[in-house]
Amino acid sequence: MGQTGKKSEKGPVCWRKRVKSEYMRLRQLKRFRRADEVKSMFSSNRQKILERTEILNQEWKQRRIQPVHILTSVSSLRGTRECSVTSDLDFPTQVIPLKTLNAVASVPIMYSWSPLQQNFMVEDETVLHNIPYMGDEVLDQDGTFIEELIKNYDGKVHGDRECGFINDEIFVELVNALGQYNDDDDDDDGDDPEEREEKQKDLEDHRDDKESRPPRKFPSDKIFEAISSMFPDKGTAEELKEKYKELTEQQLPGALPPECTPNIDGPNAKSVQREQSLHSFHTLFCRRCFKYDCFLHPFHATPNTYKRKNTETALDNKPCGPQCYQHLEGAKEFAAALTAERIKTPPKRPGGRRRGRLPNNSSRPSTPTINVLESKDTDSDREAGTETGGENNDKEEEEKKDETSSSSEANSRCQTPIKMKPNIEPPENVEWSGAEASMFRVLIGTYYDNFCAIARLIGTKTCRQVYEFRVKESSIIAPAPAEDVDTPPRKKKRKHRLWAAHCRKIQLKKDGSSNHVYNYQPCDHPRQPCDSSCPCVIAQNFCEKFCQCSSECQNRFPGCRCKAQCNTKQCPCYLAVRECDPDLCLTCGAADHWDSKNVSCKNCSIQRGSKKHLLLAPSDVAGWGIFIKDPVQKNEFISEYCGEIISQDEADRRGKVYDKYMCSFLFNLNNDFVVDATRKGNKIRFANHSVNPNCYAKVMMVNGDHRIGIFAKRAIQTGEELFFDYRYSQADALKYVGIEREMEIP
C-alpha cells in the first residue's frame, strides 16, 4: 500500500517535469530554427545587395556626368562658408557654399495615435502589456504607483512568466513529444542512473522519427492534465483535449469542422436546411449598422420575427411563359392558400398575453410537422378542422378575394398543399442537387409563393419544377413569418397623443435620476408586451426599430412629424436628445437621399457625418489645438468625438496612468461605457478645455447608439481655436490646463 501511494504522488510530479523539459527543448529548438532562418535570409539579402551594387557601379562608369559649375570663391557671401566636395571618380573637386540655418522652435509633444472616423469597441485588457515610463520625478514622488498599477491587473504583466507563452504550434508539438512516454514510466526516478541514461538515449534516437509522423493512438489524459497544471490560463484538461482534436483534424487535407457547411458552389455541396445555410450570415452580419464583422456592436440582434407590411417589390402575377406553373390545374389556388395562411396564421407566442384578437382560433390549421411520413395524418386533421370550424372565415376570405379570382378558385383556398397534389398533372421526375435544394430553401423564406422569381434566381430549374418541389416539401418547410397585425393600427394623431402622455411618464421617472443613462440593448421577447420585465423599460430606454416587440409597442419611439428644421424643443426627437431616425421621421427631411447636401432636417448631422473642416496647429493654451477653417453658426454641428469604446472598469485602470501624464482623452458615454481617444480618435481630440468655451459636447442617441457630438455654443469665426468644458473641478483645471485663453472683446 505504501508503494502504491508513493507512485500516485510521484506520477503528477514526474509528468510536470516532463512537460517542463519538453517545453524548454521545443522552445530552444524553435529559437535555433528562427536563428537559422534569419541568418539564411540575411545572407540572401546581402548577396542581392552586392549584385545590385555591382550593376549600378558598372552603369555609373559608362555614363558621362559633368559637374555643376559653381563659383570658386564664396567668401564674399554673407553668412556662408566654403565647403569642398571631392569624389573618388575622375571628377574635379567642387566648392559650394555652406549656409547656416537659424534655430527653430520645436513643435509641442505629441504621442502617436491612430485616426478614426467612428467609434471602435475594444475588450478589457486583463494583462498589463507594458510598464509605462513616468520619469524619475513621478517615481520619486509616488514610489508605490507601479505596484498599485500592477495590482489593478491582478499582478499579470505581459512576458513576466517564464513558461507563459504557448501557441497552437508548440502545443501540438508538446503533446506529440510527451506521447512517447508510457504511463508505466512514472517511477523513473527510482531507476539506476545507467538505466535512465539508456532510456534517454533511446528516446533521443527515436524522437525524430516519432515527431515526423502522427501518433498512432490518442495521447493519454495525464498529458493534458500535466499541461493544464503548468499552463492554467490555457484551460482545463478537457478543453485542451478538445483543442488538440481540432488542431490535428484541421491538418488533414480537405477536412472541415463538424459544424461547417460545405460551399454551396463547390462539388461537395449538401442539401441542408435554411437556418444552416444562413448561419454564417446571421452570425457575422450586424443588423444595426448593416455590416459584416461589426466592431461596434458585440451583441448582434436576432432577425426580426415580423414581416414587412408593404413589400418593396411588387409581385408579378402574370405567367412567365407557356410552360409556367400557373397554367397547371390548382397552381393559383395553391399560391393563394399559402398567402392566406401566412396572413391569417401568425406563429404561436411563447407564453405571454395576446394583444390582438384572432377571427377564430378553432379555424386555424395546425403547424406542419417535420416528419414527412406523418404528413397524411396531419393533412386529415387540417381538413377536419377547416370543415368544422372554418366555414365562416372561408366565406369572409372568399368575399375579399372575389375581385381578383373566380369562385372556383375561392372555394379551393381552404385546401392544403398536400391535398392539392392529386389535382395537378403528374410531376416530372427531376433530380435536385444539394446546392439547388439549399438555395431553394433560402429563397423560399424571401419570395414565398413567387416561384417564377425563385426559378430565375436558381437558374437551372423551371418555375414548374420549383413549384413541384415546393409541394413535395410542404410538410418540412417552416411557416412564413406573420405580418405585424397583433394590434390594429392607430391613427397618427391619437398615436402621438398617447406617445406624449407616455413621454411625460418617462420624464417623471428620469427626473429623480437624470444622470443614469444606460447603454441600449434590443429587447428580445417576441409576441410579449414591453412591461416592467422588458430590459428597455428597466434601463429607461425607448424601444428602437431593432427590438423584437411589435411596431405598436407603447415604449417605442415613433419619431417626429416636423415640417421644419427639428432644431427646437418642439421636435420630439430634439427634446429627447435624439437624432431623427430616417426610418421613422419621414416628413422632416431626415429620410432624404444620403448624398443630398442641403437637408432640411438639422437633427441628423452625426449619422450623416456632416462635420466641419478642422485644422491642427500649436495652441496658445497647452500643447496642440484645433482650429476651425470655415465660420459656423450657433448650435451648428462641428464634429463627433470618436475613439475606443471601453468599459467603466477599463477606464478606471487607464485613467490612473493618464492622471500621471496629466493628459486624458476619456469621455463618459453612458453608465456602461467610456470613449477613450488616447490611442484611436479624430482631430477633435485636440480641442482644449476652457471655462468660457465656444463649443459644447452633447451625448445623443443615434439609431440606437450613444454618440458624442461637438456643437458651436456661439457663432465662431474662421481661424478660431475650439474649446469646450471638460467639467474639471477647479483644482484639476489648474493642474491640467495652467493657462486660460483670453476672452474675446465684443
UniProtKB/Swiss-Prot annotation:
Compositionally biased residues, Basic and acidic residues: 196-222, 374-385
Top class in the EC scheme: transferase
Region (Interaction with EED): 39-68
Result of altering residue 667 to I: Strongly decreases histone methyltransferase activity
Mutagenesis / variant outcome for changing residue 621 to M: In WVS; uncertain significance
GO biological process: B cell differentiation; cardiac muscle hypertrophy in response to stress; cellular response to hydrogen peroxide; cellular response to trichostatin A; cerebellar cortex development; chromatin organization; DNA methylation-dependent constitutive heterochromatin formation; facultative heterochromatin formation
Enzyme Commission number(s) of this protein: 2.1.1.356
Result after altering residue 185 to H: Decreased histone methyltransferase activity
Domain CXC: 503-605
Composition bias type Acidic residues, residue spans: 182-195
Gene Ontology MF term list: chromatin binding; chromatin DNA binding; histone binding; histone H3 methyltransferase activity; histone H3K27 methyltransferase activity; histone H3K27 trimethyltransferase activity; histone methyltransferase activity; lncRNA binding
Chain positions covered by the region annotation Disordered: 180-222, 340-426
Transmembrane segments: none
Domain (SET) ranges: 612-727
Induction or repression: Expression is induced by E2F1, E2F2 and E2F3. Expression is reduced in cells subject to numerous types of stress including UV-, IR- and bleomycin-induced DNA damage and by activation of p53/TP53.
SUPFAM superfamilies from the UniProt entry: SET domain (SSF82199)
Annotated catalysed reactions: L-lysyl(27)-[histone H3] + 3 S-adenosyl-L-methionine = N(6),N(6),N(6)-trimethyl-L-lysyl(27)-[histone H3] + 3 S-adenosyl-L-homocysteine + 3 H(+)
Spans annotated as Interaction with CDYL: 329-522
Signal peptide positions on this chain: none
Effect of residue 641 to H: Found in patients with follicular lymphoma; also in diffuse large B-cell lymphoma; somatic mutation; changed substrate preferences; prefers substrates with greater methylation H3K27me0<me1<me2
Record-listed cross-link Glycyl lysine isopeptide (Lys-Gly) (interchain with G-Cter in SUMO2), residues: 634
Phosphoserine: residues carrying this PTM: 21, 76, 363, 366
Disease: Weaver syndrome: A syndrome of accelerated growth and osseous maturation, unusual craniofacial appearance, hoarse and low-pitched cry, and hypertonia with camptodactyly. Distinguishing features of Weaver syndrome include broad forehead and face, ocular hypertelorism, prominent wide philtrum, micrognathia, deep horizontal chin groove, and deep-set nails. In addition, carpal bone development is advanced over the rest of the hand.
Known function: Polycomb group (PcG) protein. Catalytic subunit of the PRC2/EED-EZH2 complex, which methylates 'Lys-9' (H3K9me) and 'Lys-27' (H3K27me) of histone H3, leading to transcriptional repression of the affected target gene. Able to mono-, di- and trimethylate 'Lys-27' of histone H3 to form H3K27me1, H3K27me2 and H3K27me3, respectively. Displays a preference for substrates with less methylation, loses activity when progressively more methyl groups are incorporated into H3K27, H3K27me0 > H3K27me1 > H3K27me2.
Protein name as annotated: Histone-lysine N-methyltransferase EZH2
Organism: Homo sapiens
Gene name as annotated: EZH2
